[in-house]
Each structure stands twice: as structure tokens, then as C-alpha cells.
């Protein structure tokens, strides 16, 4: 652990991003053992992922944003960076959602969203891949921002453990997300190798987002409270626009909600225990 305290935060963010990507790869590998899984189990997994993201948004992002602003001279305006960043994060994801072509899990290809290419329509597999990729980037960015914030005089064991806790939480919820993409692709007729490939590659943006997030806050330390809240807003948009609705459309509302609550508690306990 002492070795980690002396490393560049961008390098640490890269390692964390590679870890979360690796967790997606593990989840995608489920396709080698099952061609299909019950919709109820898939919904529970999505609920768990939503719970982790909601808890991470508050405990690991919004709360530190408010604390940082309070400790750095914002006074009675300490709420402003968190509020502004949170809203900007949601708006940014809405714009991406409106532009990038994608398809939510369980939907027919006719319900694809975003701007479709005129010359060649994207396949269902590609659209599902883009849907997962859209919300994997803010997860990686969130991890990167938490590590980048350590450069602002916060490179303590507690601060480092808090950032690691977020990475572990994101990694945990990436396992069901990987399965949630690879299994439907396999069920749609693709080979196990192709389903695994698409599922795994959907999170390649996470180490990229992690490096970008860490580098950005290192370059402009003043935006740390805004960046933390921005990542939280982006993640909450994904949860409310995609994860929760998708998990609630098949009549499994009770168990899905319980899955969400378990995910929330797991992430909350990890953040408090490690941070």
C-alpha cells in the first residue's frame, strides 16, 4: 500500500480502469457456460448494478464534492459546485444519448435510439454494444476523477482507500453488466466468442475515461468539486434512464428493487469501511 501512495495518480487511475474493465471481461465470460439465463436473474443483476451506482454517486462523488468545496473557501456557496456539476453531468449524458445510436436491452431493433447512419443501418449487436458503452465511460471517468483528486494534497491512505473502494464497487457492478450484454448477444444467434468479444469490449472505454478524468483534474485542480459531481450526475442519468427502467419491464419489480437495495448497501459499506 505504501508503494501506491508514491505513484502518479494518472497511473493509478489507469490501473483502476483496467481493473474495472477486467471485471466486465469476467462477466462477459459467463457466455461460455450459459447460452441464456433467466430474465429474473438478469433483472436482479441490473438492479444490483443500479444500487451500486446510486450509492457510489453519493458516497464517493457528491459527498466528497461538497466536502472539498467547503474546505476550499466556497463558504455558503459550497453547494454550488455539486449542484452545477451534477446537472451538467446529466445534461451531457442526455446529449450523448440523443446522438449516439443505441438499443436498450430487451427492445426490438425498431426501437433503437439516437441518430442512425443513413447509408448502413447498425446491427442489433452493435446497437446493444453502444448502449452499454455509453454508460461505461462515465463510470471510468468517475474512477479517474477520484484518483485525480488525490493530487490536490489528499494523497493519504484514507483518500487512496476511498478511491480504491469506488473502483472495486464499479468493478463489482461491471460483472453483471458484462453478462447482461454477452448473454443477449449469444441468445441472438452469435457465437460464444463473438458474444464474449462484444461484451468485453464494451468497457474498454473505462480505462480511457479513468485516465481522462484523472488528467483533467490534475490539470485544473479548481474543477475537482465540479468534476466529482459531474461524474455523479452522469451515473445517475444512466441509472434512471436505463438500468432501472430495463430491470422493471418484465414483472420482476420486487426482486429487482431488493437487488438495488443490496447493491446500494454493498457500495455504501465499502466506501465507509475503506474510505
PLM-predicted stretches and their roles:
Residues 1-275:
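Intrinsically disordered, metal-sensing/regulatory segments
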Amino acid at each position: 500500500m505504501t508503494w501506491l501512495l508514491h505513484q502518479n495518480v494518472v497511473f493509478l487511475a489507469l490501473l483502476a480502469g483496467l481493473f474495472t474493465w477486467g471485471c466486465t471481461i469476467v462477466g462477459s465470460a459467463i457466455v461460455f457456460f450459459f447460452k441464456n439465463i433467466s430474465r429474473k436473474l438478469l433483472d436482479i443483476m441490473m438492479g444490483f448494478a443500479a444500487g451500486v451506482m446510486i450509492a457510489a454517486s453519493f458516497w464517493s462523488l457528491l459527498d466528497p464534492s461538497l466536502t472539498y468545496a467547503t474546505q476550499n473557501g466556497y463558504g455558503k456557496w459550497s453547494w454550488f459546485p455539486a449542484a452545477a456539476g451534477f446537472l451538467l453531468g446529466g445534461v451531457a449524458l442526455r446529449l450523448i444519448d440523443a446522438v449516439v445510436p443505441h438499443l436498450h436491452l430487451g427492445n426490438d431493433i425498431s426501437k433503437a435510439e439516437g441518430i442512425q447512419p443513413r447509408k448502413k443501418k447498425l446491427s442489433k449487436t452493435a446497437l446493444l454494444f453502444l448502449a452499454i458503452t455509453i454508460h461505461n465511460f462515465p463510470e471510468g471517468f468517475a474512477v479517474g476523477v477520484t484518483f485525480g483528486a488525490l493530487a490536490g494534497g489528499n494523497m493519504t491512505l484514507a483518500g487512496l482507500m476511498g478511491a480504491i473502494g469506488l473502483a472495486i464497487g464499479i468493478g463489482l457492478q461491471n460483472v453483471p453488466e458484462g453478462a447482461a450484454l454477452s448473454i443477449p448477444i449469444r441468445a441472438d444467434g452469435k457465437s460464444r466468442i463473438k458474444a464474449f468479444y462484444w461484451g468485453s469490449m464494451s468497457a474498454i472505454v473505462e480505462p480511457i475515461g479513468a485516465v481522462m478524468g484523472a488528467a483533467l483534474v490534475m490539470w485544473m485542480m479548481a474543477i475537482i468539486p465540479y468534476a466529482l459531481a459531474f461524474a455523479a450526475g452522469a451515473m445517475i442519468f444512466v441509472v434512471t434512464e436505463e438500468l432501472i427502467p430495463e430491470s422493471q419491464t418484465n414483472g420482476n419489480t420486487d426482486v429487482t428493487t431488493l437487488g438495488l437495495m443490496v447493491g446500494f448497501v454493498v457500495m455504501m459499506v465499502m466506501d465507509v469501511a475503506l474510505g
